[in-house]
Amino acid sequence: MAIHKIRAFFNLEASGGIVLALAAIAAMIIANTSLNTWYESFIHAPVAIQIGSFSIAKDAHHWINDGLMAVFFFLVGLELKREVLIGELSNVKQIILPAGAALGGMVMPAIVYLFFNYNEPEFWRGWAIPTATDIAFALGILSLLGNRVPNSLKVFLVSIAIFDDIGAIIIIALFYTNDLSLGSLAIAGLCLPFLYMLNRRNVTSITPYLLIGVIMWIAVLKSGIHATLAGVVLALFIPLFDRTDPEHSPLEELEHDLQNTVSYGILPLFAFANAGISLKGAGFGELFHSVPLGIAAGLFIGKQVGVMLMCWLIFKLGISTMPKGMNFKQIYGAALLCGVGFTMSLFIGGLAFAGETPLFDERLGIIMGSIVSGIAGYMMLKTTLKDEVNVTSVDLTRHS
């Protein structure tokens, strides 16, 4: 029966990654065919919310990236908080490892990019493009491996990506934002003591947290900083335990409620809205311009070298230890996946070279570096992870 096949597919651990990949492939095909006009109309369709004199007007693309993706980052923040309190990151030393790896994974790509452009000072402002990691696509690729992935590896990659995104947001605020609104940031900051008070008073109803979270999200959005940061911050205040009922965990209930919505709704929509890059008019020869070449090399070479070098140094100095159930080959696979810069790199590239005469196309370097990193990371992990339960090979025909 068809319904059984569909149910069996969605029971696969890898199904979320498969749906994400299909959405990205569909977008790339559509954007480079005659359907591109429809695609552009869809992602740039104006959507506005107005209450009295207050209004937020964005196109669909921005609502997906700034709004829906804040929900994804909220879920990631919930998972991260749980791991810090009772999971893989409950030891402070284990937090140092992904934080250091993220730092190395940002510094080295910038160095590689500047090496390729050391004779071109006018292109130095693109140094931050290869420092980014697209957490959604990196985790999507990881999920293709199903439940062979140890939880420690997923937490390690998520932690690196979170620190990386925070670093990217700081870089954007310091180097690429001309109209930062301190007033809006102050409003966002004022939300924090209220969230803290709710947590300390053991308020387990999610509604007041979400109401304050929406206010904080709007303030961060208006400030000029990437609004998804509000999702991570809000997650930190959701109580893990109900002090009056130890069996009740508001945080874990939220995780469970959001998982399918994010995996099969938000992330595929995000992939579809961001992967549709039209390459019409872009020559392959442009890839060898110092800017796209430096970006591609920064993502593929710089990321893996930076992450691995910092991990090796941290282990060598005894600052932290190898996460349980992991080895250097798996860390290397995760380091490769960190080179999937994609959407955040595209965003920074648009800021760095806004209004630039098209002597080159930085998107080519981002796409090439991200694709090569993603494929290499997937292949590396596929060959190193133990196939304890090969969920990708479930026989979908057995229910027919």
UniProtKB/Swiss-Prot annotation:
Membrane topology according to the record: Multi-pass membrane protein
A GO MF label: sodium:proton antiporter activity
Coiled coil residues, start to end: none
Source organism, top-level taxon: Bacteria
Principal location listed in the UniProt entry: membrane
Reaction(s) the record says it catalyses: Na(+)(in) + 2 H(+)(out) = Na(+)(out) + 2 H(+)(in)
Gene Ontology biological process terms, A to Z: regulation of pH
GO-annotated cellular components: plasma membrane
Sorted UniProt keywords: Antiport, Cell inner membrane, Cell membrane, Ion transport, Membrane, Sodium, Sodium transport, Transmembrane, Transmembrane helix, Transport
Subcellular location, record wording: Cell inner membrane
Pfam families in UniProt: Na_H_antiport_1
Alphabetized InterPro entries for the sequence: Na/H_antiporter_dom_sf, NhaA
Transmembrane domains' residue ranges: 10-30, 60-80, 95-115, 126-146, 155-175, 178-198, 218-238, 265-285, 295-315, 334-354, 364-384
Record-stated family: Belongs to the NhaA Na(+)/H(+) (TC 2.A.33) antiporter family.
Function, as annotated: Na(+)/H(+) antiporter that extrudes sodium in exchange for external protons.
HAMAP family the UniProt entry points to: NhaA
Protein name: Na(+)/H(+) antiporter NhaA
